[in-house]
Amino acid sequence: MELIEVILSKENLNRAYKKVVANKGASGVDGVTVEELGDYIRKNREKIVTSLRNRTYIPKPVRRVYIPKDNGKKRPLGIPTALDRTIQQAIAQPISDIYEEIFSDYSYGFRAGRSCHDAIRQALEYLNDGYEWVVDIDIEQFFDKVNHDKLIQILREQVNDSTTLNLIRKYLKAGVMENGLEKATITGVPQGGPLSVVCSNVYLDKLDKELEHRGLRFTRYADDVLTVSYT
């Protein structure tokens, strides 16, 4: 069975819908709330599924919002519509299942059963084992600079389904709506949608594998990487 059929299965779509409803969240550019989403899907489910299957579905741009960071700056988020969040979640679920089997044990961000506390616990274990030197790596503006072609190339190694990859690319290129103006997204994965966190882990898994290949001790949470050594 092709991955797109797994994504579009009733069970997977229902699971994705329930996840989006449970997370609540703001509406996107179309103004449709999570509370209104169920009725919309019931009326349009067949049309939505058909358009996703035959590649005619067009995601709406994300709505740009900013949230304050601890350093006084603001973090840009992109809020997809409630429907697009559901579709993204439906894509993210089976892709996460595929990659969970190959992701590094030292990657802790946005993975089921893992948290920042686990990443901190791993770092403390390194210190207790005598690793006194620490290098903290924060990949500057990582989410804004992800190369779309490179990401699709990496995904293709495990996702052998052109319809699914085409849909993911559409979400990467969906654009951003800010102050009434739509801007194209040439690079990056806007933070705020279920797909962005999965794609970021897939992209950075190459870094994890390189660190492991070099025999380095590390822990990674999203785009924050901590490496340790004795000297």
Positions of predicted regions on the chain:
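Non-catalytic, polymerase-adjacent accessory regions of viral genome-replication enzymes
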Residues: 1-42
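Conserved residues at beta->alpha junctions
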Residues: 7, 81-82, 229
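Short helix/loop capping segments that flank catalytic or ligand/cofactor-binding pockets
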Residues: 16, 87-88, 144-146
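Short alpha-helical scaffolding segments that buttress acidic/His motifs in well-ordered protein cores
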Residues: 16-20, 90, 167-172
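Active-site substrate-recognition loop segments, prototypically the cytochrome P450 B′-helix/B-C loop
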Residues: 27, 31-101, 110
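Conserved polymerase palm-domain catalytic core
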Residues: 51-66, 70, 105-106, 110-230
